[in-house]
Amino acid sequence: MDRLLFVGGMFPKNSKKIIEYSKGNVQNAANVLQWGIIKGLTESERFDITLCSAVFVGSWFKLFRKLFVKDFEESDKIDYIPFFNFPIIKNISRYFAVKKYVRNWVEKNKADKLYIIAYSAHTPFIKAISKIKNKTELNFHLIVPDLPQYMNLASKTSILYHFFKSIDLRIQNKYLKQVDSFTFLTDMMSKKYNIYNKSYTVVEGMIDKDNKVKSTNLQQEKLLVYTGTLEEKYGIMNLIDAMQYVKSDIKLVICGMGGAVNKIKERSRLSNKIDYRGILSYNESIAVQSSATVLVNPRTNNEEYTKYSFPSKNLEYMMWNKPVLAFKLDGIPDEYDEVLIYFDSENPMDMAELIDSLFQKTDEELQEIGRKTTEFAIKNKNYKKQTEKIISCICNTTN
């Protein structure tokens, strides 16, 4: 039998504890993508699957309230890997804990053909699996949603952080030769990260049309909605500035956490057009999305990293039969151009003009735009189709 171990940082989608313990954004996008991949792998019936998770959370005390992380809710689906959540020591603890778990899994199943998928370019995962792979025969596939050198761009980072990050990247590069194949979110990522020219596939994200929520917009207000990271670097204040020029009777609903929160709260106090709702659970977040008239992502295309990332928020939005308004980033394939609506300027007045033009359309016109958007996503980016690309890449790669 072919056995597959999925090593990631997932947690139950509706976990309330992770919100309770977190002091910043919860990694809902990463969590949703992992569960989409897991669902696709499970339904393929190609492997006997084991799930283990060293949960992706911020370090104690600044970003997370727990020093020792074990689990969040009892789960018969996930083996949680405990780790010590102190800065710097955290990654060392995660490495040894993951290595022990993987070694035991390999020993238990050594009579079978073994595959391991690791989610994210996380050095403790890569090093731990590579060390075990040195001593046994297994196929190692790495999913890379973000390049490590472009992570934490929104945070204010110290010289010490950059020093340790450079060491981390050198260690990671050393062990990448043990990876048999990759999944990247954009083709450009391979050119930057795939230094040993291994096989790869590109999966920018996926949607699950089975996700159902009730709309929170009981009054049928005209809502422009953004849910996600709240950093000036990612264009949120530009969007808020645009609202002062919007003539339509609409409201901008914002959910999330980040460095711009205090400014957003202040602007929401000064304007009844801005409605800040704080940090929400995944289900609460998608309920707000489903209540939107138009969904918006204000992230701009003025940084190098946009070539090496895909805005998963856009694909998440595309589930809801709503128009999606965004900037065309370098990492967005051209096939999306037929269904996404793009800002052509970062100028708040120009942004307001496009927002107004959308909200002046009839409900039927907006519904038709949304229908085409969701139809495209369901047909081309559903979790089964996207996961099949990963499975094909793995199975067509020999050790």
Predicted features, each with a name:
Residues 162-165, 169-213, 275:
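Donor nucleotide-sugar binding/catalytic pocket of nucleotide-sugar-dependent glycosyltransferases
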